[in-house]
């Protein structure tokens, strides 16, 4: 690592750890999302093959988020996330099983109470071609919330024709409609806090073929992360989001929303083995 880059890395680490220590108290809770890009269990069939050092680096990145609760995406199975948890004492997890090799779930510290969750199948609007959501009930201090973790349909290189791309947009819109129904049903309970976090595979500002419209147009939904930029391509808006209903958003501390830049924590070649996404976190008051 060049001397200048190493100096910047050290400066970032010191400042970030100071920020995390300030958050590590009972008056706030840090909630986020992290797509770990094909996190496998280490066998020969893994799509993205990682070394033990790579699993350690993933744990380092998670630790640096300071998250009390982290939505996690693209996890092959329980064994895969346990490879990371070896290096994260004090964390527990819950994981779905109907996302094939890309399951979603939640990672959380002992600082938070998290009840046993369940997969929310209505988000998988096209059966096993989609991933269901994962819902948990959480609380810390005087803040209790219902949270869903999602990984919506992507529009990728595999969608190689105009027809396939149009179909992917339609599929994601269906999923967003299911999220709107869920958010509305939770919000109908007076004072109930609801949060959706995960990889939405789209950004709020999209003008052509937008797919998040059903949530954006809701007067009871706030995209807390809509102004964040991609850590990989800074000119792009991010697709990893934390979304809250108005009750939960009233607890939001806007200065705490940020992307955790992996390439400032690790050399580039190591950062690339962690994920093609960076964690996104937000902070809420628990008072």
Please tell me what each predicted stretch does.
Residues 19, 181-194, 201-287:
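Metal-dependent phosphoester-hydrolase catalytic domains
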């Amino acid at each position: 690592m060049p001397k200048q880059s190493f100096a910047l890395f050290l400066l970032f680490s010191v400042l970030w750890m100071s920020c995390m220590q300030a958050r590590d108290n009972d008056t706030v809770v840090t909630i986020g999302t992290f797509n770990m890009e094909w996190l496998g269990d280490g066998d020969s069939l893994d799509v993205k093959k990682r070394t033990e050092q790579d699993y350690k680096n993933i744990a380092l990145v998670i630790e640096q988020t300071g998250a009390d609760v982290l939505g996690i995406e693209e996890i092959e199975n329980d064994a895969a996330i346990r490879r990371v948890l070896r290096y994260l004492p004090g964390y527990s997890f819950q994981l779905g099983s109907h996302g094939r090799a890309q399951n979603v779930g939640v990672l959380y510290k002992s600082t938070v109470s998290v009840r046993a969750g369940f997969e929310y199948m209505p988000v998988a609007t096209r059966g096993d071609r989609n991933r269901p959501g994962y819902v948990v009930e959480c609380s810390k201090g005087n803040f209790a919330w219902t949270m869903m973790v999602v990984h919506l349909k992507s529009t990728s290189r595999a969608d190689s024709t105009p027809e396939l791309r149009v179909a992917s947009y339609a599929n994601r819109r269906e999923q967003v409609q299911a999220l709107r129904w869920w958010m509305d049903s939770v919000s109908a309970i007076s004072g109930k806090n609801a949060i959706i976090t995960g990889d939405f595979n789209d950004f709020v500002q999209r003008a052509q073929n937008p797919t998040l419209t059903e949530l954006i147009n809701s007067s009871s939904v706030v995209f807390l992360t809509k102004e964040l930029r991609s850590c990989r391509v800074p000119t792009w808006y991010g697709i990893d989001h934390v979304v809250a209903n108005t009750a939960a958003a009233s607890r939001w501390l806007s200065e705490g929303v940020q992307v955790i830049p992996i390439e400032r924590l690790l050399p580039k070649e190591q950062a690339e083995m962690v994920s093609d996404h960076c964690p996104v976190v937000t902070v809420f008051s628990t008072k």
